Amino acid sequence: MFYPDPFDVIIIGGGHAGTEAAMAAARMGQQTLLLTHNIDTLGQMSCNPAIGGIGKGHLVKEVDALGGLMAKAIDQAGIQFRILNASKGPAVRATRAQADRVLYRQAVRTALENQPNLMIFQQAVEDLIVENDRVVGAVTQMGLKFRAKAVVLTVGTFLDGKIHIGLDNYSGGRAGDPPSIPLSRRLRELPLRVGRLKTGTPPRIDARTIDFSVLAQQHGDNPMPVFSFMGNASQHPQQVPCYITHTNEKTHDVIRSNLDRSPMYAGVIEGVGPRYCPSIEDKVMRFAERNQHQIFLEPEGLTSNEIYPNGISTSLPFDVQMQIVRSMQGMENAKIVRPGYAIEYDFFDPRDLKPTLESKFIQGLFFAGQINGTTGYEEAAAQGLLAGLNAARLSADKEGWAPARSQAYLGVLVDDLCTLGTKEPYRMFTSRAEYRLMLREDNADLRLTEIGRELGLVDDERWARFNEKLENIERERQRLKSTWVTPSAEAAAEVNAHLTAPLSREASGEDLLRRPEMTYEKLTTLTPFAPALTDEQAAEQVEIQVKYEGYIARQQDEIEKQLRNENTLLPATLDYRQVSGLSNEVIAKLNDHKPASIGQASRISGVTPAAISILLVWLKKQGMLRRSA
């Protein structure tokens, strides 16, 4: 039977991509349905209990700037907050929080259940309704059919998921959850390129069986960082330390002597694993010269005794896992409460997607998260938000939106996936962004919140706070520009006490702040430049904008030159065999990728600058040279 009410957007899957997609579509006023196999696991952290990190924290801040959920949820659930790369420049600083799994899941579910325009329904999806190469609905395992104008697939590792522990394996979406086999078969019938990837997770340890007294502690930062631009540290629950142990030669001997029982090394697993989150077997073999690896013992929550040993992801048999765990300091008597495992799953080639994450072949069908070949909660959440907002726009007959590489890490992520594809689980790093000085965590709202407001993602409260912050920044910069001190002034001695070289000429507050030894905090304790802003976010922006003004201006010039290519559009139906002068290799690659713009075409491996020049001349001759706004 058909469900009596039609929907604008259907989201299939309630993980980090699905929850952001559902919230985005509903915030934009579209009637949204979230279908999940289990309402109790909405927002579940399937692997490590943490949010953020290098590159990943940037994505979380961008999701937040666009009105998303993840940052707000972790502010309510984070039990240890730290700034990584704190001693480095602002471009690569990143926030990371250890999470209480239960509190995080509760925060996500509460937000979903109180979101207008959103209905949640518990049923696994087994089929899509496709008519004339357009998706028009979904079918659940009990045969119930739902109609919609757009469907977003956010199914994580569930598509034909296979769990491996040693040489034994069984079907599963993750430990304790069934796989989605009928939906996997249905998607394989569609004109989509499919592959297999693999990821893994470590065994979980009973904290009561660990001797923490012999281990080094790692505490969070004080003052505590905050993830959401709307958040504050008072929202954080109780904070707790993590602990550090190490593998050793005994650990490595156990692993090396049991490699024949590893499904990866025995050839049982076909899928490629994540390069930047390797299993302990991989680490021992790839870095044979190292006699130890650092392992972080991370609490899974305030009310749980489970410990997540970050760094020993493994699919070795359970008896070997026990030996590995007990070979490490402080863990000699440790007990495992959940075994580690590897999971293989289907993913679909993201080169078959538009930058909006809509399929090039099935109209109205969007893909987000691990199904696109990424790894990580943050990468999934960012894609989910983008797919959800574009599904909402499509259902409202509006043009799609995707950020440029110069606008957001989300733009880098989507461009990398849709242009280059991936042969291994893709993880975000700051090094992937060529304009990272512009794409900092601290200015994600300045880059994206105004766009989010135009798209209908940003509510009145966030918009008011954003405008207040802008006014505070502008007012403070004007104050510092117009406040001067001269070498002969009474205040000069007070100022000189904080400078490596005394004043030799008149200087404004901004001139002083540009000096490497001066900080905004220090400057605003000096009589001529007091008091400091009480708005800490605005104060941070003032300091960064002043200190890095020259570098930022230079990077902005580079971006403007590059935008000319980014905005030169290529027709989706263009057959590149028509373009005389292109090599057969270039023709094949362009016809295979179908790039959306000259900028995207230029990043395809093998497409040379000469080929781009030929293409531009041909487009001009044909009267097809057009640029987007």
Curated annotation (Swiss-Prot):
The keyword DNA-binding does not apply. Homodimer. Heterotetramer of two MnmE and two MnmG subunits. This is tRNA uridine 5-carboxymethylaminomethyl modification enzyme MnmG. FAD binds at G13, G14, G15, H16, A17, G18, V125, S180, Q370. Belongs to the MnmG family. Pfam families: GIDA, GIDA_C_1st, SAM_GIDA_C. NAD-binding protein involved in the addition of a carboxymethylaminomethyl (cmnm) group at the wobble position (U34) of certain tRNAs, forming tRNA-cmnm(5)s(2)U34. NAD(+) binds at residues 273-287. GO terms for molecular function: flavin adenine dinucleotide binding. One of its GO terms (biological process) is tRNA methylation. PANTHER family: GLUCOSE INHIBITED DIVISION PROTEIN A, PROTEIN MTO1 HOMOLOG, MITOCHONDRIAL. Its main location: cytoplasm. It is found in: Cytoplasm. The gene is mnmG. Its cofactor is FAD. Coiled coil: none annotated. Keywords: Cytoplasm, FAD, Flavoprotein, NAD, tRNA processing. GO terms for cellular component: cytosol.
